[in-house]
């Protein structure tokens, strides 16, 4: 059977260019039969110097030399294994178009070649790296020539191991919040993460006298029951950051579910479809935008249990929490926020069952917003709610007639508002300060017995700190917020006293626990020693012989002698000698034996603690 023309040309020697013709090179590619015949009909041409390949469906002869840059079989199989799942990930319409393009332009061979050549290049580079490493370790035995087959298999194993690690990592950490952080939070904690906070803080001198009940804040929060945490969010106090900590950074049996693109998270109780947190990021602004204490106390029970009958409503404990900030910094931050177009028009300001009228609460600007407002204009408005905002939002406005300024004189009104805000703040379950992030985290954890996963961060640079004001403007801002200044001074004093009290209580509890462990170890040792001594005496001697040798037996003296011989080398030798001399004296009383027992046991306990 005669061979085809293209096969004969493929098996025959390649045509040489004409003598004197310039040497030219071309990129090897697949030729059709027509191109091969045309190339063969032009001896001396460039196409004649390139060996024509067979058409589709016809393989090369067994004598044809292999390509020099043919990748290993491992990479070809890996490319084929990776191409199918990658192609399956495309949408249905995209896959149909890719099939059409592949039938029309034959892109499969191009993709296959690119993938195999890329893997081959990576394999060769890794092979040289591995050969260099093995040559350093094993010497001349690890040569590149001897590692061709082994390195290819090793490379394939490394690639598969890498892909497996990526799959496991995507399973364990599916989103931006890796579950490993939650596992790390359940592990053993740092011995004392707040010691640096104690050392860095300056010495604090209290100004107010608070009782033990005011300083000791320990809330028995039952997240599986009906208790509810209500977050009172005051504008520009860092409440947004703290609110995110509550839904994203807190360690819970059933964490809040926060999905990408959604502003609210689902914070359900374990085993129930009820929320345990009433805040912006869990329930939204259900009582209005930045609702104050007056609105929340009358709105939250109706929102949570509004659909139930009054007789079937559970007896809930509403634990109110909030965050305060330095009044000057907060005022400047609100001014910068208003400059950017914030209005808080959605705030309801409901008091005593109705919102204020336009005469009771006039607006400081005309138009849609107050963007571009200068600081002087912001301070000149007498109806600006930014003035003394923290006192107004923490006090009971029903005591002063809500927003009706004609109910009582201004001086009396300010006094009632300030005292109401102080009282509500002191009786709140928890409040924090923006200027003390780590202390805020500590007090919240100790109050509710709920730990955060990662520590809070103290930001020293804010938009308010970037505003440069002179002393005159600062004095005026303090004058406009004189009630907030008084409230913040009171809150800071109470906050720092609570922190110091809780830290001292924690140290006392740790010291008491060590003492209990010491007593337990001492009793355990004495009990074990008496049992072993009594068993040894009963087995070695009879009762009559024991009485004849020692008419007045004293087990404490024997214990002292045994302790003096069995103590660790760290024990005091002088005390051992004194115990031996005391045991040899005749007529020694019970008190001397007890003294020796106490000394020997204390030395033993001390040696055990030194070893630990």
From Swiss-Prot:
Glycan attachment residues as annotated in the record: 209, 404, 460, 546, 558, 562, 574, 599
Membrane association type: Single-pass type II membrane protein
PANTHER family linked to this entry: HEPARAN SULFATE 6-O-SULFOTRANSFERASE 3, HEPARAN-SULFATE 6-O-SULFOTRANSFERASE 2
Stated role: 6-O-sulfation enzyme which catalyzes the transfer of sulfate from 3'-phosphoadenosine 5'-phosphosulfate (PAPS) to position 6 of the N-sulfoglucosamine residue (GlcNS) of heparan sulfate.
A GO-annotated cellular component: Golgi apparatus
Bias type Polar residues, positions: 565-577
Gene behind the chain: Hs6st2
Protein name (database record): Heparan-sulfate 6-O-sulfotransferase 2
Organism: Mus musculus (Mouse)
Annotated GO biological process: heparan sulfate proteoglycan biosynthetic process
